[in-house]
C-alpha cells in the first residue's frame, strides 16, 4: 500500500490498528512475528579468508611454484653433495609473497561499519501509545500499527503515516537531500499518477529523520528493513565493489606475465633438453641435466616476475595518501588515489557539498531594511546564540535572525525592547504566523510574516520612507514583480507586514488581527553555493572532468544553482526523478550524457545515474554527505564523503573523505591522483623494462649455451637494486601539464600511450648492454687481467662474465630510473630535482658494490672480484642507457607533434 495516498482510516485498517494504538499484548505478538525494528547486519569476511585470497593471484602462484621447485632442487642437490647449499632462494621468494599478502590485507578498506552507522541514526527510545497510555519503549521494540508521539527534537524511529500534527516540521536532509525542514500534514496527497517523490510525501515521517518544530502523532507502517532507511541498508549490502582501473590493469598485467612466463619456461626447458640431447649430456647424466634445466626455468620465472611491483605500488599509493591527508582528503582505500586521477564524471550532491547547507538571506525588497530585518527576526522562534555567533532553531527562521544580526540587530537585545506578548502560530492553511510585541511605553505592535501572496492581499497600506501609505494596484503589482523576480532565481521568498494596535489584548485571531496591515518588505533566501566551488568546477572542466549535480531539492532551485556554477547552460539539461522514472534503462543509457542536473531524486535514482555513466565506460565519482548518498557512493568508482556534515553511513562506504567538506579539495585530490598514477606508470615501466632485460638475457644465454645469471642474482636486482629507485620514482613531482590533459580512458591497457613499445625497446637496449658486458668479461678480460686466477681455479671465465653482467645490469637499471623521471619528456628539462631518486641510486650502487666486494657475499652469489678498470667499463656501458633513451624519446615527441597526438592524463 502507498500509505501517503490513503486516508487515515484506510492506513489504520491496513495496519490492523487504530488511532488509539495497540495493546501491549498485540505489540508483543507482532514483535515475535515480525522481529525487531532493526536493520539487518551484513556478513563480515573473516580476516584469515582475506589473507588467503591474497595468494590466488597468478603472479603470486608462479612465485610459490618457483619457490617449491627451487626448494626441491636444493634438497636433491644437498642429498647427493658433500657441500650443503642454503635454500636462500626459497626463503627470499616466500618472504616476498607473505609480505605482499600482509600488505594487501592491511590496506583493504571495507564498508562493514556502514550498517552499524545506520543503526546509530535510529532513535534509541520512543514515545508510543500502548493500552491507551503514552509510554516510553525501546525503538527496536516498535511494531507496525504502533502510534508514536513526535515532538521537537525527537528522532523518527520508523516509517509512519502522520495522523495528527500541529505545525510539525521534520528535517529530512540526510535522507532526501532537502535542505529545508518539511512542513508535515495529515491530509491525503493528491497524486493522479500514484508516484510521489520521497521529499514530497508530506504526510509521512521516515526513520532517521528528526522533528525540529511542532508536534504530532503517526501510525507506524514500516519497521526495520521495510523502511526507506532499510532500502538503503539493503542497497549497501547488495552493492558490489568492482575493481578499480589500476587493479584491473595490474590483474591484466599479471595474466600477461603468467602466460609469458609459462610459455618461455616451456620453450627454454625444451631448448635446454634438446641441447643436452645433442651434446650427449642428457644420456650421460639424466637427473642432474634435468634438474639443471629446471633451475634455468626457475631463474626465468624469477626474472620475468617483478617481485617488488606489488610492494612498490602499495607504498607509492601510501605516499599519495599521506600527501592528500595534508590537503584535507582522507583516503580510506588505497586504490582510490589512482582512480581519482582518471575520474571523468563527478556526480555531486547539492546540499552541503556544492552549497553551505545553511539558508541565508541574499536579497530584500522594502524601503526600510532595518525594520524589515528586525520584524522578520522578532516574528520567529529561532534564538540567537551569543557563543556561536549565529542563530539556532529551524533553518529558515535562523536565516532571518542571522540576517538581522548582520544589520546589527541582535535578537536577544531587540526582544527585550519589543517584548512578545501574544502570537498566532503558523499553520499550513494560512501560510503565515503573527507575533505581538509591547514597547517600554506600552504600545503594541504586530508583525506578520509568511507567503508573499497571502500577506499582500491582507495589506491596505505599505511603508514608504517611514510612513504608512495607502496601498494602490500599481504598488501591489510592483511588490508582486519583486516577488516573482526573486522566485525566478529560485529564492525562497517571505513577506512581512506590521500593524499598530490600540492596546494589548488577551487573545489574537486571524479574522480580527491579520488584516488591514502595512506591508514592510520581502526577503529572498537560498542555501548559497560555497565560494570556492565555482573555481573548482572551472578547474574540473579544464582537466576534462564533467560535474553532474544530483539532489533531492526542487528542480528550479537545482537549475538556478547549477547555472550559477556553470554546471549547465540551459534548463533543458536538467531532469527530475519523476521524469527519470518514465525513461527505460536502455533509453537512459543512451541519453545520460544529455543531463547534468538531476532534481527531486530518490536514493535508487542516484544509484541508477551512477551506474548509467559507468555502463558507458566513464570513471565516475560520487560525492555526498547524507544517508541517501550511501548506496550510490558505494556503487561509484570512487565515493567521496564529507567529514564535517557527512553521516557515519556515508563515511564508512566512501573511498575518500573530505575533512573540510570542500568541493575544491576534490580538484586538489584529482591532481594528486594524476601525479600518483603518472608515477606508478613510471615505476611499472622501469620495473618491467628491467625484468624484460633479465628475461631476454637469460633467453639469449640459454640459446647460446651459457649461464649468465643465477636466481639469487635476479632476486637481488629485483628486490634490492630496483625497488629503491622504483619507490623514489613515486616521489616525483607532478609534471607541468598534469591538470591540462584530458582524463585517460579507463579501457586503455597498462601498455597504452606507447608504454608497451617503451618497455620493449628499453628492455632490448639494457639486454644488449648486459650481453656485451658478459662477453667483455668472459672473452676479453678473462684473457687479460684474470688469466692467472682462472688458471688457478679461483673462478671461471663464465663467472667473470656473470660478474660483469651482474654489475652492469644493476647499474644500467639504476641509471635507467633517471630516464623514467619523465615518460615522454627530456629529463634534462626537468627543473626540480628528485633527491629521493639520487639517494636511492647511491644506496643501490653501494649495496651492489658490497655484494661484489665483500668476500662472503661474493662467494654466496658466486661473483668474481673486479678491479677499477672493470668498474669503469661497467659504468660506461650502464650510463649509455641515458643518451640512447633520450634519442628515442626525442624522435617520439617529434612524431606526436607532427601527427597532433595529445597524451591523456
Predicted regions located by residue number:
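Alpha-helical transmembrane segments of multi-pass integral membrane proteins
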Residues: 79, 758-773
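Short N-terminal signal/transit or membrane-insertion segments
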Residues: 150-151, 781, 810
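A C-terminal functional module that forms or caps the active site or interfaces directly
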Residues: 820
Amino acid at each position: 500500500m502507498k500509505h501517503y495516498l490513503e486516508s487515515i482510516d484506510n492506513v489504520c485498517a491496513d495496519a490492523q490498528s487504530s488511532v488509539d494504538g495497540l495493546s501491549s499484548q498485540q505489540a508483543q505478538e507482532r514483535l515475535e512475528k515480525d522481529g525487531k525494528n532493526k536493520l539487518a547486519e551484513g556478513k563480515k569476511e573473516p580476516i584469515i579468508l582475506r589473507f588467503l585470497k591474497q595468494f590466488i593471484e597468478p603472479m603470486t602462484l608462479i612465485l610459490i611454484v618457483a619457490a617449491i621447485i627451487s626448494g626441491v632442487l636444493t634438497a636433491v642437490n644437498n642429498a647427493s653433495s658433500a657441500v650443503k647449499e642454503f635454500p636462500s632462494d626459497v626463503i627470499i621468494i616466500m618472504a616476498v609473497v607473505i609480505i605482499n599478502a600482509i600488505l594487501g590485507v592491511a590496506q583493504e578498506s571495507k564498508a562493514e561499519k556502514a550498517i552499524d552507522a545506520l543503526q546509530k541514526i535510529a532513535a534509541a527510545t520512543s514515545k508510543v501509545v500502548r493500552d491507551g497510555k503514552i509510554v516510553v519503549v525501546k525503538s527496536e521494540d516498535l511494531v507496525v500499527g504502533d502510534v508514536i508521539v513526535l515532538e521537537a527534537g525527537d528522532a523518527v524511529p520508523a516509517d509512519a503515516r502522520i495522523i495528527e500534527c500541529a505545525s510539525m516540521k521534520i528535517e529530512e536532509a540526510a535522507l532526501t537531500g532537502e535542505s529545508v525542514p518539511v512542513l508535515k500534514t495529515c491530509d491525503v496527497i493528491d497524486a493522479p499518477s500514484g508516484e510521489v517523490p520521497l521529499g514530497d510525501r508530506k504526510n509521512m515521517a521516515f526513520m532517521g529523520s528528526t522533528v525540529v518544530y511542532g508536534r504530532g502523532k503517526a501510525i507506524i507502517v514500516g519497521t526495520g528493513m521495510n523502511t526507506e532507511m532499510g532500502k538503503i541498508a539493503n542497497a549497501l549490502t547488495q552493492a558490489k565493489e568492482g575493481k578499480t582501473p589500476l587493479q584491473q590493469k595490474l590483474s591484466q598485467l599479471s595474466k600477461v606475465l603468467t602466460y609469458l612466463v609459462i610459455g618461455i619456461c616451456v620453450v627454454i626447458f625444451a631448448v635446454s633438453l634438446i641441447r643436452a640431447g645433442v651434446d650427449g649430456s642428457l644420456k650421460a647424466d639424466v637427473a642432474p641435466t634435468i634438474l639443471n634445466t629446471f633451475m634455468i626455468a626457475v631463474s626465468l620465472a624469477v626474472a620475468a616476475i617483478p617481485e617488488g611491483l606489488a610492494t612498490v605500488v602499495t607504498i607509492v599509493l601510501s605516499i599519495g595518501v599521506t600527501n592528500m591527508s595534508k590537503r584535507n582528503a582522507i583516503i580510506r582505500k588505497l586504490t582510490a588515489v589512482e582512480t581519482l586521477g582518471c575520474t571523468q564524471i563527478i556526480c555531486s550532491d547539492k546540499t552541503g557539498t556544492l552549497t553551505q547547507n545553511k539558508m541565508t538571506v541574499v536579497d530584500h525588497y522594502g524601503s526600510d531594511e532595518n525594520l524589515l530585518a528586525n520584524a522578520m527576526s522578532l516574528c520567529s522562534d529561532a534564538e540567537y546564540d551569543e557563543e556561536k555567533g549565529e542563530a539556532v532553531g529551524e533553518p529558515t527562521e535562523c536565516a532571518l535572525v542571522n540576517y538581522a544580526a548582520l544589520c546589527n540587530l541582535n535578537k536577544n537585545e531587540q526582544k527585550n525592547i519589543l517584548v512578545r506578548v501574544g502570537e498566532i502560530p503558523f499553520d499550513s492553511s494560512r501560510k503565515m504566523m503573527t507575533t505581538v510585541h509591547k514597547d517600554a511605553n506600552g504600545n503594541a505592535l504586530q508583525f506578520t510574516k509568511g507567503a508573499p501572496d497571502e500577506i499582500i492581499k491582507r495589506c491596505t497600506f505599505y511603508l514608504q520612507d517611514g510612513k504608512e501609505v495607502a496601498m494602490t494596484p500599481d504598488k501591489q503589482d510592483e511588490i508582486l514583480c519583486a516577488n516573482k523576480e526573486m522566485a525566478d532565481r529560485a529564492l525562497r521568498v517571505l513577506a512581512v507586514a506590521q500593524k499598530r494596535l490600540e492596546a494589548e489584548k488577551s487573545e489574537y485571531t486571524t479574522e480580527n488581527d491579520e488584516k488591514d496591515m502595512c506591508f514592510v518588505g520581502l526577503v529572498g533566501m537560498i542555501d548559497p553555493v560555497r565560494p570556492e566551488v565555482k573555481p573548482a568546477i572551472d578547474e574540473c572542466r579544464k582537466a576534462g572532468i564533467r560535474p553532474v549535480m544530483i539532489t533531492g531539492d526542487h528542480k528550479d532551485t537545482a537549475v538556478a544553482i547549477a547555472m550559477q556554477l556553470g554546471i549547465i547552460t540551459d534548463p533543458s539539461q536538467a531532469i527530475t526523478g519523476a521524469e527519470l522514472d518514465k525513461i527505460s534503462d536502455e533509453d537512459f543509457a543512451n541519453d545520460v550524457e544529455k543531463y547534468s542536473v538531476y532534481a527531486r531524486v530518490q536514493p535508487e535514482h542516484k544509484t541508477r545515474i551512477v551506474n548509467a555513466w559507468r555502463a558507458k565506460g566513464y570513471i565516475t565519482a560520487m560525492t555526498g554527505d547524507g544517508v541517501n548518498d550511501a548506496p550510490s557512493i558505494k556503487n561509484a568508482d570512487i565515493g567521496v564523503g564529507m567529514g564535517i556534515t557527512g553521516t557515519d553511513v556515508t563515511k564508512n562506504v566512501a573511498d575518500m573523505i573530505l575533512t573540510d567538506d570542500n568541493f575544491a579539495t576534490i580538484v586538489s585530490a584529482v591532481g594528486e591522483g594524476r601525479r600518483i598514477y603518472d608515477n606508478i606508470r613510471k615505476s611499472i615501466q622501469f620495473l618491467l623494462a628491467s625484468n624484460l632485460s633479465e628475461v631476454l638475457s637469460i633467453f639469449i644465454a640459454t640459446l647460446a649455451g651459457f649461464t649468465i645469471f643465477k636466481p639469487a642474482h635476479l632476486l637481488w636486482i629485483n628486490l634490492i637494486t630496483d625497488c629503491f629507485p622504483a619507490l623514489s620514482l613515486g616521489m616525483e613531482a607532478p609534471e607541468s601539464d598534469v591538470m591540462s590533459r584530458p582524463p585517460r580512458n579507463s579501457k586503455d591497457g597498462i601498455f597504452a600511450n606507447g608504454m608497451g613499445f617503451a618497455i620493449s625497446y628499453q628492455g632490448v637496449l639494457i639486454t644488449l648492454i648486459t650481453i656485451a658486458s658478459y662477453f667483455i668479461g668472459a672473452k676479453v678480460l678473462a684473457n687479460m687481467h684474470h688469466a692467472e686466477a682462472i688458471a688457478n681455479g679461483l673462478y671461471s671465465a663464465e663467472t667473470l662474465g656473470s660478474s660483469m653482467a651482474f654489475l652492469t645490469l644493476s647499474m644500467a637499471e639504476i641509471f635507467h630510473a633517471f630516464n623514467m623521471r619523465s615518460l615522454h619528456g627530456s629529463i634534462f628539462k626537468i627543473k626540480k630535482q628528485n633527491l629521493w631518486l639520487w639517494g636511492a641510486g647511491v644506496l643501490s650502487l653501494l649495496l651492489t658494490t658490497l655484494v661484489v666486494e665483500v668476500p662472503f657475499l661474493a662467494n654466496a652469489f658466486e661473483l668474481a672480484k673486479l678491479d677499477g678498470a672493470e668498474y669503469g667499463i661497467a659504468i660506461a656501458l650502464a650510463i649509455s642507457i641515458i643518451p640512447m633513451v633520450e634519442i628515442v624519446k626525442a624522435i617520439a615527441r617529434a612524431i606526436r607533434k607532427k601527427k597532433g597526438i595529445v597524451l591523456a592524463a
